[in-house]
Regions:
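Core SAM-dependent methyltransferase catalytic element
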Residues: 178-180, 198-219
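Class I SAM-dependent methyltransferase SAM/SAH-binding core
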Residues: 30-32, 36-83
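A short SAM/SAH-binding and catalytic strip from SAM-dependent methyltransferases
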Residues: 93-107
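A short glycine-rich, Lys/Arg-flanked "PGG" loop and its adjoining helix->strand segment in the class I
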Residues: 107-122
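A short acidic, Gly/Pro-enriched loop at the edge of an enzyme's catalytic core
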Residues: 84-94
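Short alpha-helix
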Residues: 161-185
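Conserved class I S-adenosyl-L-methionine
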Residues: 1-25, 38, 42, 62, 123-153
């Protein structure tokens, strides 16, 4: 994965996230589930004050080491999003990018994310689109994505563990029930020129792999 993420992050997720974020200078931002820290570093380089939480020791170790070699002022915390609440500040923005569908106990994690926001702050999260979880290979072979058992919750085995399929309504209702108002939903689309230069990503011209939601914490 490159300094600004893999192809999907560079061409689909990052442009969407930064469009939803707007100006970053001076904002307090929590990167919830930061992985190896690429997004936290991008945010800090644009002037945000960043706290980044990651449970996995290998990812956390890499991100913390990068902070020692490139001082951006990022505060890294190794902790579980479902249980950690000890933040020193309230945040203008909490971002959980490609995280919640990897967490078995996702509702406490969403609660902790929204609790960490100041009134009026933004909760932005991205997911593997639960409506269209077919692989690139399936789309290439069939020309469509087949949807099965959409309304159930289950584990989709991955090399890293489970991707937990949940209906989209479960996430949206969880945000609303935690005192937030949904402001914008984006299904990132790949332009044909980028797709032609990156074989294996053609489906994103027609069928979104991701969905990004921005919500605001109500007073």
């Amino acid at each position: 994965m490159g300094e600004e993420g893999d192809f999907s992050r560079q061409h689909l997720l990052n442009p969407t996230l930064f469009a939803l974020l707007g100006p970053l200078e001076g904002k307090e931002i929590l990167d919830a589930g930061c992985g190896y820290g690429y997004l936290a570093r991008m945010l800090a380089r644009r002037g945000a004050r960043v706290t980044a939480v990651e449970p996995a020791e290998s990812f956390f170790g890499y991100a913390a080491e990068r902070e020692r070699t490139e001082r951006l002022g990022i505060r890294y915390v190794q902790a579980d999003l479902s249980t950690f609440r000890d933040y020193a500040v309230t945040f203008d923005v909490v971002i959980a990018s490609m995280v919640l569908m990897d967490i078995p106990d996702y509702l406490p994690a969403m609660q902790n994310c929204t609790d960490a926001l100041r009134s009026g702050g933004s909760f932005i999260f991205s997911l593997a689109h639960p409506c269209f979880e077919g692989t690139e290979r399936e789309y290439h072979d069939k020309g469509y994505v087949e949807v099965k058992e959409y309304l159930a919750e289950y584990c989709l085995p991955q090399p890293f563990g489970c991707l937990f399929h949940r209906p989209l309504s479960h996430y949206l209702n969880a945000v609303i029930q935690r005192g937030c108002a949904i402001q914008e939903i984006v299904e990132p689309k790949l332009d044909p020129a980028s797709a032609s230069a990156a074989p294996g990503h053609e489906r994103n011209v027609h069928v979104p792999s991701f969905i990004v939601i921005r919500a605001a914490k109500l007073p």
